[in-house]
Design a protein with these regions (language model features):
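Compact, Lys/Arg-rich rRNA/RNP-binding cores from ribosome-related proteins
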Residues: 22-256
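A positional/structural detector of protein chain ends, strongest at the extreme C-terminus
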Residues: 3-4, 255-257
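N-terminal amphipathic/basic-hydrophobic helices that include classical n-h-c signal peptides
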Residues: 1-21
Length: 257
């Protein structure tokens, strides 16, 4: 009878991609939050508040390779309808050598071009790079001349800031895009905070005039020491400070009597 006959169900093949996706573990928190969550545990949570605040309150870099719309809506000239527009930054690659100079926020743009500018021909990869110059720049605060790789945009920004030191001190880290620039800023802020007498030791009037010129940028020395440090450098600095405090607490304290 038909009811006594067992019919095998058809076997449906499962793609390997589905099996791999099913085997992937589910994370408790989104991957995008991992960097922020790292700052809340372990030695990272014991970093100074002003340093953690500088990591959490990262601002949007100033547009360099594209022109923002500046508005959320625009009128379409073809149909007269209001349409939403969005600023989409161009992805920029900052090579390691950009951290050793001052490129003014410029970097490499990775893209494609058509052979002989013919849209019917093959597309090939292309990298657009900024034009670089070697210039000697002088710092009043550090009283030192630096030979730095710069772009024309950097030179224009220095002129707009009315000086090299003003450019370094006024420009946020998101626009400097340079480890060398942040190290310079830390050195300048430390000298301003300490009112270092080694600056023009034979000319106190000139030294006082320089410190007065940049007095608006003075911050406590304890904060200036952390300016421009990467997270790894800050963690190492915090570890050494904690080890020093632990050693000091273990040393016997001599009685003053």
């Amino acid at each position: 009878m038909v009811g006594d006959v067992e019919q095998d169900s058809p076997i449906i093949p499962v793609p390997c991609e589905v099996v791999r996706l099913a085997a992937m573990p589910l994370h408790k928190f989104p991957v995008g939050l991992w960097k922020q969550l790292r700052l809340r545990e372990g030695i990272c949570s014991r970093l100074p508040r002003h340093y953690l605040r500088s990591l959490e309150e990262a601002r949007t870099p100033t547009p360099v390779h594209y022109r923002p719309h500046g508005v959320k809506f625009k009128i379409n000239p073809k149909n007269g309808q209001r349409e939403r527009v969005e600023d989409v930054p161009i992805p920029i690659y900052y090579p390691p050598e950009s951290q050793l100079g001052l490129w003014g926020g410029e970097g490499w743009i990775l893209g494609h071009r058509y052979i002989n500018n013919d849209k019917l021909s093959k597309r090939v990869k292309k990298v657009w790079k900024p034009q670089l110059f070697e210039r000697e720049l002088y710092s009043e605060i550090l009283d030192t001349k630096f030979t730095i790789t710069v772009t024309q945009r950097t030179l224009d920004l220095i002129d707009e800031a009315y000086g090299f030191d003003f450019y370094i001190l006024k420009t946020p880290k998101e626009d400097l895009c340079s480890k060398f620039g942040m190290d310079l800023k830390r050195g300048m802020l430390l000298r301003l905070a300490r009112q270092d007498p080694q600056l023009h030791p034979d000319n106190p009037k000139k030294r006082a005039a320089i410190y007065s010129k940049y007095k608006e940028f003075v911050i406590p020395e304890a904060e200036a020491e952390w300016v421009g440090l990467t997270l790894d450098e800050a963690v190492e600095k915090q570890r050494l400070l904690e080890e020093k405090q632990q050693l000091d607490s273990c040393l016997p304290q001599s009685d003053s009597s």
